[in-house]
Amino acid sequence: MATLQLLRAPLLCVLLWVFCAPGARAHDHGADVHHGSVGLDKSTVHDQEHIMEHLEGVIDQPEAEMSPQELQLHYFKMHDYDGNSLLDGLELSIAITHVHKEEGSEQAPVMSEDELVSIIDGVLRDDDKNNDGYIDYAEFAKSLQ
């Protein structure tokens, strides 16, 4: 259970990081979860270098000219694969597993399906304030505060 909470924080962080760094392009980068026991990890979302990697070729604005809020928005959009301005369980799953792979070493244990489901359920429970089964941008931004 503690492992799930630790992975949840990195998922949310990755999401925040993508939104906060210019030059990040839509890519399969995950989000960190960290919000109390479950949620977005602010440090990952604010990792400008990683976000810029993903926005390269997508955003022409220099990273120095982007506000943290602009970076957060780009990070969010980067993980919104279907373009509906909402993050669903599958999009959260992709973000989480991407972060798990990047942060772990080659010997990092594979996350089980049950662990992944538990993390996603925790993110939705803690951050989906209107209980619609999705994380919208307002909920995403609020979870990073």
Curated annotation (Swiss-Prot):
Keyword annotations from UniProtKB, A to Z: Calcium, Endoplasmic reticulum, ER-Golgi transport, Golgi apparatus, Metal-binding, Phosphoprotein, Protein transport, Repeat, Signal, Transport
TM regions (residue ranges): none
Localization: Endoplasmic reticulum-Golgi intermediate compartment; Endoplasmic reticulum; Golgi apparatus
Single GO cellular component term: endoplasmic reticulum-Golgi intermediate compartment
Taxonomic superkingdom: Eukaryota
Domain EF-hand: 67-102, 115-145
Binding-site positions, Ca(2+) 1: D80, D82, N84, E91
List of residues binding Ca(2+) 2: D128, N130, D132, Y134, E139
Secretion signal, residue range per the UniProt entry: 1-26
GO MF annotation terms: calcium ion binding
Phosphoserine modified-residue sites: S105
Annotated InterPro entries: EF-hand-dom_pair, EF_Hand_1_Ca_BS, EF_hand_dom, ER-Golgi_Adhesion_Reg
Broad class of the protein's primary localization: endoplasmic reticulum
GO biological process, one term: vesicle-mediated transport
Known function: The MCFD2-LMAN1 complex forms a specific cargo receptor for the ER-to-Golgi transport of selected proteins.
Assembly and binders: Interacts in a calcium-dependent manner with LMAN1.
Name the UniProt record assigns to this protein: Multiple coagulation factor deficiency protein 2 homolog
Taxonomic placement: Eukaryota, Metazoa, Chordata, Craniata, Vertebrata
Gene name of the encoded protein: Mcfd2
